[in-house]
Amino acid sequence: MEGIDLSKYLKNIPEYITGRNRYNPVDMLKTVLFAFADNGYCSLRKLEDNCKVNMRYMYLMNWKTPSYRTFGYFINEVLAESIEAIFQDINLAIFAQEKVDLSHLYIDGTKLEANANRYSWVWKKATEKSRYRLFAKITALLDEINEELSWSGLRMETNEEYVPEHLAEMLAAYARFYQLDEADFVHGKGRRKTIRQRHYERLQAYMHRLEEYRKKLTICGDERNSYARTDHSATFMRLKRDYMGNDQLLPAYNIQIGVADEYIAVADVNHYRSDMDCFVPLMEKFRGLYGFYPEYPVADAGYGSYNNYLYCEAHGMKKYMKFTMFDKESKDRKYRENPYRSENFRIDPDGVMRCPNGKAFHFCYRKNVQGNRYGRQEEVFECEDCSGCPYASECKKTPKNRTVRINRELTAMHREVLDNLNSIHGALLRMNRSIQAEGTFGVMKHDRRYRRIVRRGIDSVRLEVFLVSIGHNLYKLCNKTMKKQYAA
């Protein structure tokens, strides 16, 4: 830490001083980072107590004892914007000292439960269904109002969909036409509302409910299907840690790390449920930190997709991420040599694909793969005639002629990945990934007891994860240094 200029990260501290003298921010930063290196995750109360009773913390704080509120303000207000830069500079200092190889990056992800109520879900599809039901109710109400206004020539326009601003204009026009004043409305038992008051209040209630649905859909966004009411950034996901034992969804964040020589080189926090969507943001963050892409990004089958393989090709990275059926392709000889798999169909001299019965497959059409950002297409082929085929029970599952979907580019990529990972170098990388990347999460969760997110909001969670990552790297550096001293 002595070789790093820490003052450049402490710019958010106000220049004016009121009350007692300010604690030294450099001492506070060192104390906070040491606390996360010492404990894995350190609460503010524990940090305050350690500054009173633990000699190491007392020395770092120069015998001062800030309160937990002071530490909380310092972390949330001063470190929030600069935590990634601190992470970068500390990593560069450690990597230069330890000669860390950043060309090999071992990637893994885990889902940590968020600090949110487990039953405070908001589902995007349910909200959309409720909104469309509300559209029908609004149309029915406007038809009633138009029937009431038929004598006047005034008409409320009906549509298939509505927005709150449009309803607000119609509500104001209705109140203006009848000179309605909410102060004159009656409520309570024994008071009878007029038909105009009923229409006004129903339209107003629909407007507020429509605004609520729009707010929920805006919070949810286009990239996820749920969120928690008590932490809008948390998404409901399936976790390995299931309290009720019924495979329920829990609010969580997807934490991604890239490990190099047992140090966390890059970390990221996402609300994606799948690891496939997290690969590109993690690589872009790595490039932002170090100015280049890793030559060998090694990951499990959760990351191997057409999009990610194309991304690796475009940025000069080798394909060392497994795909979904990698283990079955590598270990299951019966599956690999199954004659009824389309990959094993022979191609005759005319370039026509033929099944084990010798029937030709003819090209039908090309189909875009839904949700693929690179415009991936599949070619659909259909067998000329499957009637009376002796292999029909093993080859197909429907009474129709068999159809197969083929993406030759993706198939070629899978062959390249198989060759890479089944080589001696690939086997060593796979072994190292399971040791380093998964081992890092094992140390964080089991040894250092960091199993659940404490803060709320994506920015605060990202701050927390970077503090934990810095602490892990300092912890690893300390262990390696002590082992070298003992060996000497």
Residue positions per predicted region:
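Basic, short loop/linker segments at the boundary and entry of helix-turn-helix/winged-helix-like folds
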Residues: 1-30, 36, 408
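Anion-binding and metal-coordination hotspots
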Residues: 21, 32, 40-53, 64-488
